[in-house]
């Protein structure tokens, strides 16, 4: 029973940002927090890079919002593992958008523009980083 609380699905919740989201929202919302690495009792195992599993899990939970936090952030890892980084940081985000469009719910996505020079208002996957 959700006690009339909105439901939020948080993908990629195993890091510091995910824990901060959990602490802020745990008492006000019905949460499902997932990550590939389960390091807390409130996190369920899910690899959001697997579109079918991600879609199924989100649809079963029936959230009002989807928060997608997961990404590779270690620049050295990203440079040496470009295919995995692309799958994780780009394709999985696109899949999250497809899922939210299908369910007609908002997506909340947090990323960084810290690798760019700040001269443009918006950036895309093809902009050259610093």
Which residues are covered by each model-predicted region?
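NAD(P)H-binding glycine-rich loop region in Rossmannoid oxidoreductase-like domains
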Residues: 48-88
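Rossmann-fold cofactor-recognition segment
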Residues: 36-52
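Catalytic helix-loop patch of NAD(P)-dependent Rossmann-fold dehydrogenases
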Residues: 87, 91-95, 114-130
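N-terminal Rossmann NAD(P)H-binding glycine-rich loop of SDR-like oxidoreductase domains
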Residues: 2-28
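Conserved glycine-rich Rossmann-like NAD(P)H-binding loop of the short-chain dehydrogenase/reductase
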Residues: 16, 29-40
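Helix C-cap/helix->beta junction micro-motif
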Residues: 29, 61, 99-103
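SDR active-site strand-loop-helix element
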Residues: 11, 34, 66-70, 107-113
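NAD(P)-cofactor binding segment of oxidoreductase domains
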Residues: 80-108
């Amino acid at each position: 029973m959700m006690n009339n609380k909105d439901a939020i699905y948080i993908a990629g919740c195993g890091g510091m940002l995910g824990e901060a989201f959990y602490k802020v929202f745990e008492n006000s919302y019905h949460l499902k927090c997932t990550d590939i690495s389960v390091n807390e009792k409130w996190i369920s195992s899910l690899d959001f890079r697997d579109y079918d599993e991600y879609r199924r899990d989100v649809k079963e939970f029936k959230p009002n919002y989807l928060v997608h936090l997961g990404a590779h952030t270690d620049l050295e890892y990203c440079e040496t593992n470009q295919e995995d980084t692309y799958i994780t940081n780009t394709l999985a985000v696109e899949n999250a958008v497809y899922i939210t469009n299908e369910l007609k719910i908002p997506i909340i996505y947090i990323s960084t523009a810290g690798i760019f020079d700040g001269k443009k208002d918006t950036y895309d996957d093809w902009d050259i980083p610093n």
